[in-house]
């Protein structure tokens, strides 16, 4: 069968040779640093439109919001001095920004506002990719199911032959479960999209001025997020937990499919087969073996 799923492991390692890099790239330093700059730019632009900071300052900040101005090496060196992840980035970035404009960078915000919004954007981007992948899988499974509506095979209970079924019936359960996972992810995404945050150090908007709520709303709009929730969730991570639980359910679904395919490819059964290419190797010492993709 076709290659199924993007990897959601954020660690780069040869252990994950069967995975793709797309999602893990979202959690790598350069991507995160660019999102950090994007969030600060959205804040500055929102504040300039509301006449909280000068327009020229926001334009200068925006013009320097490029990863080439934020070397990870420079960040690491600065962090050794200031021992603060966000301040290290701000200090490095300010070196390329006009000194007067730099006074308005990160104006009124607090560290947790920025990092939590960056995390929201990372999760949003990862869900977008995963849903796209699951939709592609849905199309494939729909075709596979239609093509095998009359492909008969033994139905089994407790591993023993029971009554006849079709392979299309079996794959229809994969199709239905995949659809439910798409809907689960869309539900979680609707909550993630409302989780951008700009509420100050203790979640009360203090330090952000009289137009704090308007600033937060406009900032999130510029980041492609929905109208933010008015409650302070900095210390309440249930939406992120729901995201992780949903990923676990998606993983479990494909684990079930993988286990079924492995069992159905057993030498004694041989009801399914994967084409892995004419040069694929099943074993380094047993030439007769044709292992499933998983091992």
Task: Label every PLM stretch briefly.
Residues 2, 112-115, 259:
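Residue-level micro-sites within transmembrane alpha helices that shape
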Residues 2-14:
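Classical Sec-dependent N-terminal signal peptides that target proteins to the secretory pathway
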Residues 216-295:
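Acidic, glycine-rich loop-and-beta core segments that form the ion-binding/anion-interacting portion
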Residues 14-191, 195-199, 203-205, 209-218, ...:
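A helix-coil-helix interface module used to build multimeric assemblies
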């Amino acid at each position: 069968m076709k290659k199924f799923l993007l990897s959601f492991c954020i660690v780069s390692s040869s252990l994950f040779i069967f995975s793709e890099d797309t999602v893990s790239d979202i959690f790598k330093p350069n991507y995160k640093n660019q999102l950090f700059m994007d969030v600060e730019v959205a804040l500055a632009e929102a504040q300039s439109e509301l006449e909280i900071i000068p327009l020229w300052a926001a334009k200068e900040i925006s013009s320097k919001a490029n990863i080439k101005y934020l070397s990870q090496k420079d960040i690491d060196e600065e962090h050794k001095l200031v021992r603060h992840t966000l301040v290290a980035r701000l200090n490095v970035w300010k070196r390329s920004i006009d000194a007067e404009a730099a006074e308005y960078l990160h104006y009124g915000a607090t560290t947790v506002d920025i990092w939590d919004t960056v995390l929201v954007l990372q999760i949003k981007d990862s869900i977008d990719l995963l849903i796209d992948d699951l939709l592609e899988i849905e199309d494939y499974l729909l075709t596979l199911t239609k093509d095998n509506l009359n492909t008969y095979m033994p139905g089994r209970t407790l591993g023993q032959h029971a009554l006849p079924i079709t392979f299309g019936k079996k794959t229809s359960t994969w199709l239905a479960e995949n659809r439910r996972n798409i809907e689960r992810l869309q539900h979680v995404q609707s909550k993630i999209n409302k989780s951008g945050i700009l509420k100050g150090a203790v979640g009360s908007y203090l330090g952000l001025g009289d137009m704090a709520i308007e600033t937060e709303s406009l900032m999130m709009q510029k980041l492609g997020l929905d109208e933010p929730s008015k409650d302070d969730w900095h210390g309440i991570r249930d939406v992120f937990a729901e995201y992780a639980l949903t990923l676990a359910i998606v993983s479990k679904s494909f684990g079930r499919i993988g286990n079924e395919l492995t069992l159905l490819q057993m030498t004694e059964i041989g009801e399914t087969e994967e084409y892995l290419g004419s040069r694929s190797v099943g074993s380094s010492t047993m030439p007769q073996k044709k292992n499933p993709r998983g091992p």
